[in-house]
Amino acid sequence: MKQTAFYQQRRVLVIGLAKSGFAAAKLLHELGAIITVNDQKPFEENKEAQQLEQLGIRVICGGHPLELLDEPFDLVVKNPGIPYTNPMVKKAMEKGLPVVTEVELAYHISEAPFIGITGSNGKTTTTTLIYEMLREGEKRPLLAGNIGTAACEVAKKAEASNWLVTELSSFQLAGIRDFRPRISVLLNIFDAHLDYHGTKEAYAQAKANIFKNQTNEDYAVINADDELVMQLAENIHAQKVAFSATKVLGRGAYINNGFIYWNDEAVIAVADIVLPGKHNLENILAAVAVAKLAGVDNKSIYQVLTTFTGVKHRLQYVATIDGRKFFNDSKATNILATQKALSAFEKDSVILLAGGLDRGNEFDALLPYLHNVKAVVLFGQTAPKIARVAKQAGIETIEYVDNVEKAVPVAYQLSEPGDVILLSPACASWDQYKTFEQRGDIFIGAVHKLK
């Protein structure tokens, strides 16, 4: 492992546990740091804190006492979900303490190069595609970050011959100092997490941090169809590699005459790809670009794209019941994701299940995508806002329910054979559910109860 000596005897404050904070605390302990862990959840209910205390780590739970920062810490590692406006984090920064996230630790200790994937939508699908292509091409990839295992846990085991394929959120990227991926991917930028970042500009800048430390020895895979992405990449040092679902580029990954091309070579016919949804073509193009940069052969890419059907909770087919098809798109935590989901069913009659956490967004951008939606079933804090837009779109059937579980039988009663019943909330889940996965699993369970 690189840079392990740096942490020996360093006094480190870890703020916030959950998966990434817990992994960071364990790693720092192994590296010989003197750690204090601080978490909001009371100790009696906090399994992670209890486990860390058993390792001999100092644990302070039940709040974030500002006086803790009067102690002489060298570094603060914060859980990515804790915003920079948090009083504890603000005080640490005012004191001039470095404040980083667990991904930074992973970079410091990893022998393997990173492939970092970010964007408002499509991160998980693209990350999974890249991992599968590199695995098929025998490039020894390891999957890390927002998918599955915390990055620093994976980085501990990584060797120089591996690739660390890492999904990165704006929360993680906002706090990087040294992190430098060999290949970065910026898929798209859309208004998201404004409650965390404050403005779209701050959110976009956090995403653009993925390029911050790259040099001309590295690659940046960027979406030529997204104007803001291209602006953010204008002055970067990495070699730019574009992908486009709408333009014939000549270089990079693009579509021409029904084929996906890499530079001037046809890789696969679009008709042979089994992953549904036009929006997934962008994810596929980005993945093809990364795979080719990592040295994967066309045969391996073809094998993945003719067998990969998607990721759970992302436009996931659930069941057909009495001629109605049910799709779980619980990962649609913003408006753009729901636009793309509705575009995938533009020739179908759709009953849309939507709503969730109110982050201050309006939903007028959904209007052009509602022409084939015959009814909406709404839940959560944003239900009235989405209902207003549905009325503008001329949708007469608008139902309010308490939650996703109750939405499913209501949607079924409103439907006819041949209809698509689509959960695509356009909102985060946190007003009612811990995660979008929990929301999606409840939807799946409710669908199966109809059988």
UniProtKB/Swiss-Prot annotation:
<dbReference type="InterPro" id="IPR004101">
    <property type="entry name" value="Mur_ligase_C"/>
</dbReference>
<keyword id="KW-0132">Cell division</keyword>
<keyword id="KW-0573">Peptidoglycan synthesis</keyword>
<dbReference type="GO" id="GO:0008360">
    <property type="term" value="P:regulation of cell shape"/>
</dbReference>
<keyword id="KW-0963">Cytoplasm</keyword>
<dbReference type="InterPro" id="IPR005762">
    <property type="entry name" value="MurD"/>
</dbReference>
<dbReference type="GO" id="GO:0071555">
    <property type="term" value="P:cell wall organization"/>
</dbReference>
<protein>
    <recommendedName>
        <fullName>UDP-N-acetylmuramoylalanine--D-glutamate ligase</fullName>
        <ecNumber>6.3.2.9</ecNumber>
    </recommendedName>
</protein>
<feature type="binding site">
    <location>
        <begin position="119"/>
        <end position="125"/>
    </location>
    <ligand>
        <name>ATP</name>
    </ligand>
</feature>
<dbReference type="Pfam" id="PF08245">
    <property type="entry name" value="Mur_ligase_M"/>
</dbReference>
<dbReference type="InterPro" id="IPR036565">
    <property type="entry name" value="Mur-like_cat_sf"/>
</dbReference>
<keyword id="KW-0067">ATP-binding</keyword>
<dbReference type="GO" id="GO:0005737">
    <property type="term" value="C:cytoplasm"/>
</dbReference>
<dbReference type="GO" id="GO:0008764">
    <property type="term" value="F:UDP-N-acetylmuramoylalanine-D-glutamate ligase activity"/>
</dbReference>
<keyword id="KW-0961">Cell wall biogenesis/degradation</keyword>
<dbReference type="GO" id="GO:0009252">
    <property type="term" value="P:peptidoglycan biosynthetic process"/>
</dbReference>
<comment type="pathway">
    <text>Cell wall biogenesis; peptidoglycan biosynthesis.</text>
</comment>
<dbReference type="Pfam" id="PF21799">
    <property type="entry name" value="MurD-like_N"/>
</dbReference>
<dbReference type="GO" id="GO:0051301">
    <property type="term" value="P:cell division"/>
</dbReference>
<keyword id="KW-0131">Cell cycle</keyword>
<comment type="function">
    <text>Cell wall formation. Catalyzes the addition of glutamate to the nucleotide precursor UDP-N-acetylmuramoyl-L-alanine (UMA).</text>
</comment>
<keyword id="KW-0547">Nucleotide-binding</keyword>
<dbReference type="GO" id="GO:0005524">
    <property type="term" value="F:ATP binding"/>
</dbReference>
<keyword id="KW-0133">Cell shape</keyword>
<dbReference type="InterPro" id="IPR036615">
    <property type="entry name" value="Mur_ligase_C_dom_sf"/>
</dbReference>
<dbReference type="InterPro" id="IPR013221">
    <property type="entry name" value="Mur_ligase_cen"/>
</dbReference>
<comment type="similarity">
    <text>Belongs to the MurCDEF family.</text>
</comment>
<keyword id="KW-0436">Ligase</keyword>
<dbReference type="Pfam" id="PF02875">
    <property type="entry name" value="Mur_ligase_C"/>
</dbReference>
